[in-house]
Amino acid sequence: MAEKRNIFLVGPMGAGKSTIGRQLAQQLNMEFYDSDQEIEKRTGADVGWVFDLEGEDGFRDREEKVINELTEKQGIVLATGGGSVKSRETRNRLSARGVVVYLETTIEKQLARTQRDKKRPLLQVEAPPREVLEALANERNPLYEEIADVTIRTDDQSAKVVANQIIHMLESN
Protein backbone atom coordinates (compact mmCIF):
# COMPACT_ATOMS: atom_id res chain seq x y z
CA MET A 1 0.00 0.00 0.00
CA ALA A 2 2.01 2.94 -1.27
CA GLU A 3 -0.39 5.71 -0.26
CA LYS A 4 -1.90 5.54 3.20
CA ARG A 5 -5.64 5.35 2.75
CA ASN A 6 -7.85 5.67 5.78
CA ILE A 7 -9.19 2.34 6.99
CA PHE A 8 -12.50 2.36 8.85
CA LEU A 9 -13.60 -0.74 10.76
CA VAL A 10 -17.33 -1.30 11.17
CA GLY A 11 -19.24 -4.19 12.67
CA PRO A 12 -21.12 -5.33 15.75
CA MET A 13 -19.88 -5.16 19.32
CA GLY A 14 -17.53 -8.04 20.00
CA ALA A 15 -16.36 -8.35 16.38
CA GLY A 16 -12.87 -7.21 17.38
CA LYS A 17 -12.81 -3.72 15.83
CA SER A 18 -10.61 -2.15 18.53
CA THR A 19 -8.21 -5.06 18.95
CA ILE A 20 -7.85 -5.66 15.21
CA GLY A 21 -7.66 -1.91 14.55
CA ARG A 22 -4.70 -1.51 16.93
CA GLN A 23 -2.93 -4.47 15.32
CA LEU A 24 -3.62 -3.20 11.81
CA ALA A 25 -2.41 0.32 12.61
CA GLN A 26 0.76 -1.07 14.17
CA GLN A 27 1.52 -3.28 11.16
CA LEU A 28 0.88 -0.43 8.71
CA ASN A 29 2.57 2.22 10.88
CA MET A 30 -0.62 4.29 10.93
CA GLU A 31 -2.39 6.18 13.71
CA PHE A 32 -5.17 4.29 15.47
CA TYR A 33 -8.36 5.83 16.81
CA ASP A 34 -11.38 4.29 18.52
CA SER A 35 -14.50 6.47 18.35
CA ASP A 36 -15.72 5.29 21.79
CA GLN A 37 -12.34 6.10 23.37
CA GLU A 38 -12.35 9.52 21.71
CA ILE A 39 -15.80 10.23 23.17
CA GLU A 40 -14.51 9.16 26.60
CA LYS A 41 -11.44 11.37 26.22
CA ARG A 42 -13.52 14.41 25.26
CA THR A 43 -16.22 13.97 27.90
CA GLY A 44 -14.05 12.66 30.72
CA ALA A 45 -16.60 9.89 31.27
CA ASP A 46 -17.06 6.35 30.02
CA VAL A 47 -19.47 5.71 27.16
CA GLY A 48 -21.95 3.95 29.44
CA TRP A 49 -22.29 7.06 31.58
CA VAL A 50 -22.66 9.32 28.53
CA PHE A 51 -25.27 6.89 27.18
CA ASP A 52 -27.17 6.90 30.50
CA LEU A 53 -27.04 10.67 30.87
CA GLU A 54 -27.78 11.72 27.28
CA GLY A 55 -29.65 8.69 25.97
CA GLU A 56 -28.81 6.90 22.75
CA ASP A 57 -29.68 9.93 20.59
CA GLY A 58 -27.34 12.21 22.55
CA PHE A 59 -24.58 9.62 22.40
CA ARG A 60 -25.05 9.14 18.64
CA ASP A 61 -24.83 12.92 18.10
CA ARG A 62 -21.46 12.98 19.89
CA GLU A 63 -20.35 9.90 17.97
CA GLU A 64 -21.28 11.48 14.64
CA LYS A 65 -19.25 14.63 15.44
CA VAL A 66 -16.22 12.61 16.58
CA ILE A 67 -16.30 10.39 13.49
CA ASN A 68 -16.69 13.42 11.23
CA GLU A 69 -13.55 15.00 12.75
CA LEU A 70 -11.50 11.80 12.75
CA THR A 71 -12.36 10.86 9.16
CA GLU A 72 -10.96 14.20 7.98
CA LYS A 73 -7.49 13.01 9.04
CA GLN A 74 -5.24 11.14 6.61
CA GLY A 75 -3.63 7.75 7.08
CA ILE A 76 -5.61 6.51 10.07
CA VAL A 77 -7.25 3.30 11.20
CA LEU A 78 -10.57 4.00 12.94
CA ALA A 79 -12.58 1.51 14.96
CA THR A 80 -16.16 2.82 14.96
CA GLY A 81 -18.90 2.12 17.46
CA GLY A 82 -21.25 -0.67 16.44
CA GLY A 83 -24.21 1.70 16.10
CA SER A 84 -22.39 4.49 14.27
CA VAL A 85 -23.76 3.21 10.95
CA LYS A 86 -27.29 4.16 12.02
CA SER A 87 -26.47 7.69 10.88
CA ARG A 88 -26.72 8.17 7.11
CA GLU A 89 -24.25 11.09 7.36
CA THR A 90 -21.71 8.87 9.11
CA ARG A 91 -22.17 6.09 6.54
CA ASN A 92 -21.64 8.61 3.73
CA ARG A 93 -18.52 10.04 5.37
CA LEU A 94 -17.00 6.63 6.00
CA SER A 95 -17.63 5.58 2.40
CA ALA A 96 -16.25 8.80 0.93
CA ARG A 97 -13.19 9.21 3.13
CA GLY A 98 -11.60 5.77 3.24
CA VAL A 99 -11.84 2.03 2.86
CA VAL A 100 -14.61 0.48 4.95
CA VAL A 101 -13.90 -2.97 6.37
CA TYR A 102 -16.87 -4.84 7.83
CA LEU A 103 -15.74 -7.22 10.58
CA GLU A 104 -18.43 -9.86 10.70
CA THR A 105 -18.96 -12.35 13.53
CA THR A 106 -21.60 -14.73 14.83
CA ILE A 107 -24.00 -13.98 17.68
CA GLU A 108 -22.31 -16.81 19.62
CA LYS A 109 -18.90 -15.14 19.33
CA GLN A 110 -20.40 -11.78 20.29
CA LEU A 111 -21.94 -13.35 23.40
CA ALA A 112 -18.65 -15.01 24.37
CA ARG A 113 -16.63 -11.82 23.84
CA THR A 114 -19.03 -9.43 25.59
CA GLN A 115 -20.46 -11.50 28.46
CA ARG A 116 -18.25 -9.96 31.18
CA ASP A 117 -17.97 -6.49 29.66
CA LYS A 118 -19.97 -3.97 31.66
CA LYS A 119 -19.07 -1.11 29.27
CA ARG A 120 -21.68 -2.14 26.70
CA PRO A 121 -24.69 0.09 27.41
CA LEU A 122 -27.01 -1.73 25.02
CA LEU A 123 -26.40 -5.00 26.90
CA GLN A 124 -27.14 -3.49 30.34
CA VAL A 125 -30.87 -4.07 29.97
CA GLU A 126 -33.46 -6.57 31.18
CA ALA A 127 -33.75 -8.44 27.87
CA PRO A 128 -31.56 -11.52 27.35
CA PRO A 129 -28.27 -10.55 25.64
CA ARG A 130 -28.88 -12.97 22.74
CA GLU A 131 -32.19 -11.26 21.92
CA VAL A 132 -30.56 -7.81 22.09
CA LEU A 133 -27.69 -8.88 19.82
CA GLU A 134 -30.07 -10.52 17.33
CA ALA A 135 -32.23 -7.38 17.16
CA LEU A 136 -29.14 -5.20 16.67
CA ALA A 137 -27.87 -7.55 13.94
CA ASN A 138 -31.21 -7.39 12.09
CA GLU A 139 -31.13 -3.59 12.20
CA ARG A 140 -27.42 -2.96 11.55
CA ASN A 141 -26.01 -5.78 9.42
CA PRO A 142 -27.64 -4.43 6.23
CA LEU A 143 -26.08 -1.02 7.00
CA TYR A 144 -22.61 -2.54 7.47
CA GLU A 145 -23.04 -4.42 4.18
CA GLU A 146 -24.24 -1.27 2.39
CA ILE A 147 -20.95 0.59 3.00
CA ALA A 148 -18.43 -2.26 3.19
CA ASP A 149 -15.62 -2.31 0.64
CA VAL A 150 -14.29 -5.50 2.26
CA THR A 151 -15.99 -8.02 4.58
CA ILE A 152 -13.99 -10.35 6.83
CA ARG A 153 -15.32 -12.89 9.32
CA THR A 154 -13.38 -12.69 12.60
CA ASP A 155 -14.82 -15.65 14.52
CA ASP A 156 -11.88 -17.91 15.37
CA GLN A 157 -8.97 -15.84 14.13
CA SER A 158 -6.38 -13.81 15.99
CA ALA A 159 -6.18 -10.05 15.51
CA LYS A 160 -2.88 -10.50 13.67
CA VAL A 161 -4.37 -12.99 11.20
CA VAL A 162 -7.35 -10.72 10.50
CA ALA A 163 -5.07 -7.67 10.14
CA ASN A 164 -2.96 -9.61 7.62
CA GLN A 165 -6.11 -10.57 5.69
CA ILE A 166 -7.18 -6.92 5.55
CA ILE A 167 -3.73 -5.83 4.35
CA HIS A 168 -3.73 -8.55 1.68
CA MET A 169 -7.21 -7.58 0.46
CA LEU A 170 -6.29 -3.88 0.34
CA GLU A 171 -3.10 -4.58 -1.58
CA SER A 172 -4.96 -6.68 -4.14
CA ASN A 173 -7.60 -3.96 -4.76
UniProtKB/Swiss-Prot annotation:
Known function: Catalyzes the specific phosphorylation of the 3-hydroxyl group of shikimic acid using ATP as a cosubstrate.
Binding-site list for substrate: D36, R60, G82, R140
Species, as recorded: Escherichia fergusonii (strain ATCC 35469 / DSM 13698 / CCUG 18766 / IAM 14443 / JCM 21226 / LMG 7866 / NBRC 102419 / NCTC 12128 / CDC 0568-73)
Gene: aroK
A GO CC term attached to the entry: cytosol
Complex and partners: Monomer.
Cofactor binding note from Swiss-Prot or TrEMBL: Binds 1 Mg(2+) ion per subunit.
The protein's required cofactors: Mg(2+)
Major place of residence: cytoplasm
First and last residue of the signal peptide: none
Keywords in alphabetical order: Amino-acid biosynthesis, Aromatic amino acid biosynthesis, ATP-binding, Cytoplasm, Kinase, Magnesium, Metal-binding, Nucleotide-binding, Transferase
EC number(s) per entry: 2.7.1.71
Record GO terms (molecular function): ATP binding; magnesium ion binding; shikimate kinase activity
Top enzyme class: transferase
Phylogenetic lineage: Bacteria, Pseudomonadati, Pseudomonadota, Gammaproteobacteria, Enterobacterales
Entry protein name: Shikimate kinase 1
GO biological process assignments: amino acid biosynthetic process; aromatic amino acid family biosynthetic process; chorismate biosynthetic process
Record-listed ATP binding positions: G14, A15, G16, K17, S18, T19, R120, Q157
Localization: Cytoplasm
Residues at which Mg(2+) binds: S18
Annotated catalysed reactions: shikimate + ATP = 3-phosphoshikimate + ADP + H(+)
Family per record: Belongs to the shikimate kinase family.
Highest taxon of the lineage: Bacteria
